[in-house]
Amino acid sequence: MLDVNFFDELRIGLATADDIRQWSHGEVKKPETINYRTLKPEKDGLFCEKIFGPTRDWECYCGKYKRVRFKGIICERCGVEVTRAKVRRERMGHIELAAPVTHIWYFKGVPSRLGYLLDLAPKDLEKVIYFAAYMITKVDAEARHRDLPTLEARMGVEKQQLEDKKNADVETRQKRLETDLAQLEAEGAKGDARRKVRESAEREMRQIRDRAQRKIDDLDRVFDRFKNMKVQDLEPDELLYRELRDRFGQYFDGGMGAEALQRRLADFDLAAEAESLRETIRSGKGQKKARALKRLKVVSAFLNTRNSPMGMVLDCVPVIPPDLRPMVQLDGGRFATSDLNDLYRRVINRNNRLKRLLDLGAPEIIVNNEKRMLQEAVDALFDNGRRGRPVTGPGNRPLKSLSDMLKGKQGRFRQNLLGKRVDYSGRSVIVVGPQLKLHQCGLPKQMALELFKPFVMKRLVDLNHAQNIKSAKRMVERARPVVWDVLEEVITEHPVLLNRAPTLHRLGIQAFEPQLVEGKAIQIHPLVCTAFNADFDGDQMAVHLPLSAEAQAEARILMLSSNNILSPASGRPLAMPSLDMVTGVFHLSTLAEGAVGEGRAFSSVAEAQMAFDAREIALQARISVRLRDTTPPSDWVPPADWVTGDVFTLETTFGRCLLNEALPEGYPFINAQLNKKAQAAIVNDLAERYPKIQVAATLDALKSAGFYWATRSGVTVAIEDVVAPPNKAEILDDYEQRADRVQKQFDRGFLSDEERRSELVQIWTEATNKIAEAMEKNFPQTNPVYVLVNSGAAGNMMQIRQLAGMRGLVSNPKGEIIPRPIKANFREGLTVLEYFISTHGARKGLADTALRTADSGYLTRRLVDVSQDVIVREEDCGTERGILTRIARRGADGVLVRDRYAETSAYARTLASDAVDEHGEIIVPAGTDAGDVAIGQIIEAGIESVRVRSALTCESRMGVCAQCYGRSLATGKLVDVGEAVGIVAAQSIGEPGTQLTMRTFHSGGVAGDDITQGLPRVVELFEARSPKGKAPITEVSGRVKIEETEKTFKVVVVPDDGSEEIAYPVSRRSRLRVREGDRIEVGNQIVDGAVDPHEVLRILGPRQVQLHLVDQVQEVYRSQGVSIHDKHIEIIIRQMLKRVNVLESGETNLLPGELCERARFESENRRVVESGGQPASARPVLMGITKASLATESWLSAASFQETTRVLTDAAINARSDSLVGLKENVIIGKLIPAGTGISRYRNIRVEPTEEARAAMYSVGAYEDGGSVEYGAFGTGSGQAVPLDEFDYRSSGDFR
């Protein structure tokens, strides 16, 4: 087998018949498969051992040679080579066809490549291929021109002869008529009889004349056709063609079927055709030029590559290895077989029949019919159903052809190459493990034993509990007591990976240290639930075991859950206390007035602890405590003589003292009630200021405290806790009367239906809000339901309003608000009508969720595909450019406050230029990471906006550079070279997409909470579609005039430079953004609505369209409260604007109208300019993500995405080469991906052992006799982990 590490590129091309024969190990001559009695393959059949190799290892067909010692011998009796049976997965055969056939991909694909090459319409091509018309393949124009006078004279003679014969025949008949009439007259016949004889004779003479005329016309037609005959003319009339062939056969060649095309392609002059097409493009216009461009693409593809157009017509068909189209026996003695075998059998049967007919010398019509059937059989084999009705198997199911094996989710690419099944894995239901540390998970004993079986077996042998591996295996299977001790030892510090499907972002797979637990459920830490989006209502998770030392090191360093506290999308912590933990911490930090022990003072926290244990003080009582070695709260006002580090007394509660013990040393004392937001802010602050280990420890301490005190807080929910406001009935009566008044006005005709609806909606919205207010005031502070909402642990006021206030207005399935409210709440219970109305919205919510989850998954897939080759490839691209971002706004009082969007725009980026204040002083120099501190300093200096590096301005040829990307949000440090930032970006955008789609579900369909604008709008932006009812933008600067007509407004812009006025018709319904006489700039919007991004690109250029798209996408996510950093969206948009459309090709190799990557365009121009030639010109193109993915340079990546057959057809004709720079292509061929530690600069590192490691090696028992030690192989064979800490990566020069 080919080793994937020995090549750097993969080229695809057109296989010629010789190539196919070269791959083949023999010709398949018979349609037989397996002998059903002996169950052995038939000789020369589709499973023949002589061709494809033995079915059993080291055994020939007849049994003469058995065992491995005969390896490589070819049996002289049966002709089978003695080798491994797995060669049946790689050896191919072939079928020699009795007549050539065309490859359906090249003739039937859209556009038809054969059609473009030969300039034939697909309809005409089909007629020729399927024997409905003849095609002229060759005309000897010289000979025809030379002999034309002779032939014309000969024709004249022949016509004259026909003319003479006609005249003679007519004359003879005339004479006979006269004789007959004379005879009748002599006999005295009546006039009637004489008339009949005359009429009959005249009829016969007319027929003679007509017959002769027809022959003459035919001759004229034949001769005309011959005179004007050119190559590629079609002739559907068989008789005419035969006449031509019989008369002028020496002057031309013609034929039907693939044979005719093959002859035509053999004579086809590519260079001359390309030249004439270029001439057409230079001089032509419109449709003609467009077609010439398309044809030139195909012609030049054949010219510039080693492909021969003859490859599109096949003389033999490859037969794929038999193990890839297996045939297995079922229980009942019947066979199940791959569809391909049926398709191959049809081809072989028809081919053999055609051979026999040709040998017999059968009539042409029968042979042609058989050839047509052979062509159809090969079509069905390559792409069943592409032309005509598909070939069906039993039960009318279309058979799966070779194309179907590649296409779609179940095809070879997506099913087997990009998604493989993994051994050393298991799955089980998850339960919570509140006792675990953040980096641990609970693994059921049985599962752990099965996963670590080989390790346990080896250790049993090492410790002499078992003599050999076999007995160790037996011990493990019988679960002997010693096995469990060994298992404990083996799993220590051996991380496992946990994964929950759907894996929407990289935190869906994390590493944990396993702890053995009883039972059969996996236990996971409560704080990682957010990242996995897991709950414990029956979710399952999969466990995978990293085996090699490198895999374990990566799992521990990069994937351990305690190293993944931050979200890669926003850079904020994901491991936040939630639910019970929030309740517990809230309870702990609450101060209750008048509690036991209020006002007492204590000399230390320990003394307060004793008082609490003795029940002298309550947890929430207000007490004073002297604190030493503690940082005071940030808002504490120190006494005049106090210095840092002194003891101080603080009025607080014992609960808060306990809470602060969970926080790291040196963290300011927290003396406030902490709801979920406040707790999140603390975790955020910790993540910014402390190392990850400390943050993880603190989170664990908070988790333990939260659970412990949540239990003791006694927060429970009973039906009595849902307290309705006492004055609800009065409020409702009041609003009921107002609603009645509106209804009466409507009945009298004072209001239109529209007005009535909006009035009622307004009235009832007000009523709902009023009841909600009354309800909130009525809730006691200690009410458990109120505590749950107030602490942020669960629910929100809107849900409480529905429980205790009133349900309010709901919407119908169209999304309109129903003007009758639901006055009841869930505590009272709904009436039947109210219940029915409210099911509308709820059902729509569920249906929406189901539909949009699929849409969101598809969006993620497209995003991943377009951005998968964006990897950080270098430290710095050296660009001077950047984008200007606003970090602060002036408040009403003129003070600068941090912009609320700075979090997702300027934060975590590298400054592109110095931040300079008004005195010219540099506050923060260029190249600094803009963290919270730097942004704070810049704002203090009065600077509103800064220029930051961005992926949009990065000048790296491939991927992006670390400086332009800035800080990796997941680690809080500058991004490493090799980070797959494209995939992170796609996941960061796609993951909340699914969240959005699922969020409608929780509001229970209450009006105004449904986000139909969300996902479809994001898709519309990323696919660069023109929005429906798009708002026009101005193309010039000038003054506005507005003209009204009956149906529309006409906004006219009078340009400043006095050129022609431009009118924009807009609907009367739209809201205008301009008034009469306004001054308007280029690119301003005239009405409210969505703008067409292609217009923005055309009028304002690439930079503006980039910013516009980022802004619009962010608008959708922000409206849902989702925080995604701009840099992720920028990476996708960088990919959408990566290509240019060539306008003039100059002296380059580019074609006008061709789409090509900007990097290729620039390097081609550079090459031409250096040699003094004329460069090409182009304009930037905005491509949607689907189109951009399919237009990628890598054909493997594009083929595995969508439209597999079209991509492969195109790639084969252009002999495209895949340089394997992206992730997908490397996964497909089984190489390490060029990201992370797979990037070449990390693969080329040699790890040398440290002195300590060498010493440790010597002390191992095996080496104590002083045997020689091979340093080079250190840490590889032994499976020992290699410490990489001491190795300085930067000092090694050969990185690239």
Curated annotation (Swiss-Prot):
Zn(2+) 2 binds at residues 877, 954, 961, 964. Belongs to the RNA polymerase beta' chain family. It comes from Frankia alni (strain DSM 45986 / CECT 9034 / ACN14a). Pfam families: RNA_pol_Rpb1_1, RNA_pol_Rpb1_2, RNA_pol_Rpb1_3, RNA_pol_Rpb1_4, RNA_pol_Rpb1_5. Zn(2+) 1 binds at residues 60, 62, 75, 78. GO terms for molecular function: DNA binding; DNA-directed RNA polymerase activity; magnesium ion binding; zinc ion binding. The gene is rpoC. Keywords: DNA-directed RNA polymerase, Magnesium, Metal-binding, Nucleotidyltransferase, Transcription, Transferase, Zinc. It catalyses: RNA(n) + a ribonucleoside 5'-triphosphate = RNA(n+1) + diphosphate. SUPFAM superfamilies: beta and beta-prime subunits of DNA dependent RNA-polymerase (SSF64484). GO terms for biological process: DNA-templated transcription. HAMAP family: RNApol_bact_RpoC. It comes from the Bacteria. GO terms for cellular component: DNA-directed RNA polymerase complex. Its cofactor is Mg(2+); Zn(2+). This is DNA-directed RNA polymerase subunit beta'. Mg(2+) binds at residues 535, 537, 539. SMART domains: RPOLA_N. The keyword Ribonucleoprotein does not apply. DNA-dependent RNA polymerase catalyzes the transcription of DNA into RNA using the four ribonucleoside triphosphates as substrates. Binds 1 Mg(2+) ion per subunit. Binds 2 Zn(2+) ions per subunit.
